[in-house]
Amino acid sequence: FTLCSGELLKIYYSDEKSKSSFWEMFSGEESIEEGQIYISEKLYKVSNMSQAVREGVGFITEAPYRSMILDNMSATENVSVPLHEKVRGFWFAKKYTRSVSDFLQNDELNKKKLKNIGNAELQKLAYEKWLVYQPKIVIIENPFTDMDINMREITRKMIGALQKRGIGVILLTANFAIMNKIKGESMFLKHGVLTREEEW
């Protein structure tokens, strides 16, 4: 498949093993047995997630407000985590962390301990990591599993914000109903084989 800047691709997977293999091919945890991946016309070959991030791929796990936020760090520090892979000496230059704080535009949020912040704000922070970093692609695992309507709407808006920044978005979902609720090309992943909608 081809994914252009700002486009969204929805992939419905029918088995957990296929989803894990797809994710791990991009994160470097699993080698590619057939075919090749190119990002911006450059062969994509990585051996770990840190290298994947440096090569322009971001990752958002299921329920990121629980799994991707470090409550012993400030909001600015959380959003800045991927940037230290991109900018040498990031943590030692105040101008960099200040620019992230300016991006967040929420001094009150940065003063609070993250354990005292609601899930909706934490969800936004998890996505804002990649808005600041601006990778070429972000792969999102089951973005709409939360049953809370407000949380789903925030997630939808944050995915749209990624697209507006020119970031390609790949959604991996086990919820077939989601396929018709968000715009974008659809593909299906079953037993390790990726097919287009008309071939399903």
Q: Which residues fall in each region the model found?
A:
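Glycine-rich phosphate-binding loops of nucleotide-dependent enzymes
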Residues: 1-200
